[in-house]
């Protein structure tokens, strides 16, 4: 089909002379760009809707694995038994009893998969890094699941776990180490007492109110 169209276009270009030939080439280029745009739309729709459920084997499955988004290493681990299904990135959608973890039964029920299916079991075992039979948020978001990037409140949690930003992260702000985690200071003391986080200055001495130095500087400037 494509070869026939190319031959037809070549014949038309040869028959048309001068400016008409230039206009025809420009028209053909526009048509080509339009076809590519339509192809991208079809690809996006097929990958999000058709591939996860319909492309299980044969040519269709091959096209999905090559054209749709997914993790190549995970696809290889699954031994090419099925396409990785894009699912919503909302952890709460799968944590049905709101206990902070996702069980195998909860996940299977949420995505409509057979809990005993080999592909489902393999993907779940890959995600369950600590082997306790349950998925924490970090295990879930770093697992072999392809997530739909819908804009919602859970995108922050998704990005946080994908970037491996954990609760004990220490940021460097203007040469000072800022502790962001309550557990950094004597276990849960800060969380239990409600005291503010400490700032570790360059001198190694903690400052409970780092803003004070800026207030004092402003007052000193006013008096001068």
Swiss-Prot record:
Gene Ontology molecular functions: calcium ion binding
This protein's record includes keyword DNA-binding: no
Expression (tissue specificity): Component of the acid-soluble organic matrix of calcified layers of the shell (at protein level).
Signal peptide: 1-21
Chain ranges of the EF-hand domain: 115-150
Record's GO cellular component terms: extracellular region
Keywords from the named record: Calcium, Metal-binding, Secreted, Signal
Keyword ATP-binding annotated: no
A Pfam family per the record: EF-hand_5
Residue sites binding Ca(2+) per the record: 128, 130, 132, 134, 139
This protein's name: EF-hand calcium-binding domain-containing protein 1
Organism annotation: Lottia gigantea (Giant owl limpet)
């Amino acid at each position: 089909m494509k070869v026939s169209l190319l031959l037809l276009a070549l014949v038309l270009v040869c028959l048309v002379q001068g400016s008409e030939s230039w206009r025809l080439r420009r028209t053909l280029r526009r048509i080509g760009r339009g076809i590519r745009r339509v192809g991208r739309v079809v690809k996006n729709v097929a990958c999000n809707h058709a591939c996860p459920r319909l492309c299980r084997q044969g040519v269709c499955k091959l096209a999905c694995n090559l054209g749709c988004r997914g993790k190549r290493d995970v696809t290889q681990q699954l031994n090419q038994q099925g396409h990785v299904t894009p699912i919503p990135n909302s952890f709460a959608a799968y944590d049905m009893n709101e206990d902070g973890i996702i069980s195998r039964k909860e996940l299977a029920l949420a995505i409509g998969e057979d809990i005993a299916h080999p592909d489902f079991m393999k993907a779940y075992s890959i995600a369950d890094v600590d082997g306790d039979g349950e998925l924490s948020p970090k295990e879930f978001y770093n697992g072999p699941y392809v997530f739909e990037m819908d804009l919602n409140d859970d995108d922050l949690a998704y990005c946080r776990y994908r970037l491996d930003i954990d609760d004990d992260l220490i940021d460097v702000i203007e040469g000072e180490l800022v502790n962001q985690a309550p557990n950094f200071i004597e276990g849960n003391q800060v969380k239990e007492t409600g005291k503010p986080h400490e700032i570790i200055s360059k001198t190694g001495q903690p400052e409970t109110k780092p803003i004070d130095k800026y207030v004092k500087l402003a007052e000193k400037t006013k008096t001068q």
